[in-house]
């Protein structure tokens, strides 16, 4: 069986299911043992800094203004490290992503500790784009089944489905989405214009590979939404990362055609997420490194910023 096709060529074209699974329609993160969250000082009008002007943000689980953070990848992260992040900034964190296959390097009990801790703070937990590696196994259908079952048993909420390194038929991509939803998990496709994105490839090599037409993202995005996908991740390579000049035209084109709440942008640099907040406001969904959560949250709240955003990021929520 070809590594780039899950099903035989004779299989009929994919069609959207008549009934979207419950997994595809529930909030990203559901936990019955949430910690009681103390109000942050900025929202405490009686004893804190609530008298300072700031932007009103929706409570979790949010569908707009979502912030997903990268967990262990550039640095190791255990329970104590994550506890520090969530005890201080958990109010601002919506999702935790284990980049690539980083989660496979953990002892199972330690990985579950991180996942369970995230859930206590109403933070959903997502895999990285390891599905690409799973599809390269000699029997990809069996491997995908085993992968999803194990991820569910570990406590993951969201399965990222990337294809930055693979050429895969669009219908097969949608079949994987259906399979993820059928397992009671949430599919989060990752799309981009740069082939070879999502790894540690040098910028010069990425440039030589060329880019795809942005209309491909838009076409697939619409099909994913029809399949019940709640949110699509947009890869930064080729758009705002490893490029001589940002492809803001691609971003604008995506948001002209796809609902903003259905899209999340990877923002790998403070200048990038500063631009997203400036251009699209506090409700834009962003994926950043966990080390950047404070800086991004200051921007969303409208209490700090760079020269072009300081004191100018506002919303109106009567």
Segments predicted by a language model, with ranges:
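Active-site-adjacent beta->alpha loops and helix N-cap segments on the catalytic face
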Residues: 104-115, 136-145, 165-185, 195-199, ...
């Amino acid at each position: 069986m070809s590594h780039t096709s899950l099903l035989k060529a004779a299989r009929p074209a994919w069609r959207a299911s008549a009934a979207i699974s419950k997994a595809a329609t529930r909030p990203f993160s559901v936990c019955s043992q949430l910690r009681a969250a103390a109000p942050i000082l900025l929202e405490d009008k009686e004893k804190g800094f609530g008298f300072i002007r700031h932007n009103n943000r929706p409570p979790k689980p949010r569908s707009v203004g979502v912030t997903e953070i990268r967990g262990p990848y550039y640095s190791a992260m255990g329970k104590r490290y994550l506890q520090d992040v969530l005890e201080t900034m958990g109010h601002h964190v919506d999702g935790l992503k284990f980049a690539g296959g980083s989660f496979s390097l953990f002892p199972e009990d330690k990985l579950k500790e991180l996942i369970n801790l995230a859930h206590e703070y109403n933070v959903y937990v997502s895999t990285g784009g390891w599905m690409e590696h799973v599809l390269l196994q000699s029997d990809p259908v069996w491997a995908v089944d085993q992968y999803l079952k194990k991820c569910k048993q570990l406590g993951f909420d969201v399965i990222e489905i990337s294809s930055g390194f693979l050429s895969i038929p669009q219908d097969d991509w949608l079949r994987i989405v259906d399979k993820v939803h059928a397992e009671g998990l949430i599919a989060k496709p990752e799309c981009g214009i740069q082939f070879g994105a999502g790894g540690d490839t040098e910028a010069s090599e990425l440039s030589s590979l060329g880019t795809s037409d942005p209309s491909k993202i838009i076409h697939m995005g619409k099909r994913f939404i029809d399949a019940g996908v709640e949110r699509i991740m947009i890869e930064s390579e080729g758009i705002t990362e490893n490029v001589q000049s940002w492809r803001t035209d691609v971003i604008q084109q995506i948001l002209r055609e796809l609902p903003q709440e259905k899209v999340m942008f990877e923002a790998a640099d403070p200048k990038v997420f500063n631009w997203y907040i400036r251009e699209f406001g506090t409700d834009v969904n962003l994926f950043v490194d966990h080390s950047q959560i404070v800086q991004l949250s200051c921007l969303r709240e409208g209490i700090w910023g760079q020269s072009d955003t300081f004191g100018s990021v506002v919303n109106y929520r009567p």
